[in-house]
């Protein structure tokens, strides 16, 4: 239902290029609910756990270096089909394949600098959320706009 959650992170290049507010704005305007957010320099061990499935890829060392090159904004968003819809809002992993109107389609050019991460499934969202956030950092609250967003 509308309690599904996803993990969204603005990567170091997105932070440096000042698109954090734009990302938050788009998720808010869509009607999703912000559940958690933190600004941090991600430790290498956290990034290695986050990207463990890519550890055998040739680009892996560059990916870890890029993701630890500056601070990131880690967020949890909640709402109906938020994982799938969030991925559509982000655009394709490769910005060259992303349509205008998507975050990557509007703000980036190259796959190695694709400014944002979004969970690719409900399962990976659960894993990523528990990796980046403690349970008590996920805020439970009633958002009064929800009645105007869902039937």
Curated annotation (Swiss-Prot):
It comes from Ginglymostoma cirratum. It comes from the Eukaryota. HAMAP family: NDP_kinase. One of its GO terms (biological process) is UTP biosynthetic process. It holds the Pfam family NDK. Belongs to the NDK family. Homohexamer. NCBIfam families: PRK00668.1. Its cofactor is Mg(2+). Coiled coil: none annotated. Keywords: ATP-binding, Kinase, Magnesium, Metal-binding, Nucleotide metabolism, Nucleotide-binding, Phosphoprotein, Transferase. This is Nucleoside diphosphate kinase. The keyword Magnesium applies. Its EC number is 2.7.4.6.
């Amino acid at each position: 239902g509308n309690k599904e959650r996803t993990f969204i992170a603005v990567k170091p290049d997105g932070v440096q290029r000042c698109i954090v507010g734009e990302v938050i704005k788009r998720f808010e305007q869509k009607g999703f609910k912000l559940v958690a957010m933190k600004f941090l320099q991600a430790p290498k061990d956290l990034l290695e756990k986050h990207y463990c499935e890519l550890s055998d890829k040739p680009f892996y060392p560059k990916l870890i270096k890029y993701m630890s090159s500056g601070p990131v904004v880690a967020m949890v968003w909640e709402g109906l089909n938020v994982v799938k819809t969030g991925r559509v809002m982000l655009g394709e992993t490769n910005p060259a394949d992303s349509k205008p109107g998507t975050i990557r389609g509007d703000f980036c050019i190259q796959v190695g600098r694709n400014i944002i991460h979004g969970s690719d499934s409900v399962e990976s969202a659960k894993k990523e959320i528990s990796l980046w956030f403690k349970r008590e950092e996920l805020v439970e609250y009633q958002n009064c706009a929800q009645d105007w967003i869902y039937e």
